[in-house]
Amino acid sequence: MKVIHEIEPVWDAGSKVLILGTMPSPASRKAGFFYMHAQNRFWQIMQNLFCEKFQFKNNAPEKELAVRERRNFLLRHNIALWDVLSECSISGASDSTIKEAVPNDFTRIFSGADIKQLFCTGKTAFNLYKKYCSKKYNAPFTYLPSTSPANRARWQDSALVAEYEQIKSFLNESLT
């Protein structure tokens, strides 16, 4: 199925890191925001890293409030968030089925914010960024394991948090 990315990136002039997924899942597209599948561990990891607790769950009936809460969280912590692809053909949420990939244009983010480091959530996001974007945008990029429910057997929660600690460490270093 051909999918066009319709979720706007989250960023502002204070953003220091850019976290990139591949393409929003069907649940995220329905919610209109990133990582909103009830079993995706991205927001749980972010809460753990920054010792914060969200009031609204990913699948809360008050989805607008859940989205606003997460958007404010990202900006408060100098984090930009988007996806590598603007469109592709994909079956469900399976990155392994991606075909006809078209990358997003990150120019407005790199020209409007001082992005020092990119973190790609999952091997597909990392490989697609490397293939389509890395030569155009001069910022280091790092692989992080996927927070997808499909990755649960390979990565326990504590191991994911340990890997994602790189984000917080980088932010702490860049803001001092």
Give residue spans per PLM region.
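C-terminal capping/extension of enzyme domains
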Residues: 1-16, 37-38, 92-107, 130-176
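Short, hydrophobic/glycine-enriched beta-strand segments
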Residues: 16-22
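Short glycine- and Lys/Arg-enriched binding-loop motifs that mark or flank ligand-binding interfaces
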Residues: 17, 28, 118
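Short, solvent-exposed loop/turn segments at secondary-structure junctions
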Residues: 23-27, 40-41, 86-89, 124-126, ...
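Short, surface-exposed acidic-centric catalytic microdomains
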Residues: 28-97
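Residue-level signal for well-ordered alpha-helical scaffold segments within enzymatic catalytic domains
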Residues: 44-48, 108, 112, 131
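Internal catalytic-core helix/loop-beta-alpha segment
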Residues: 76-124
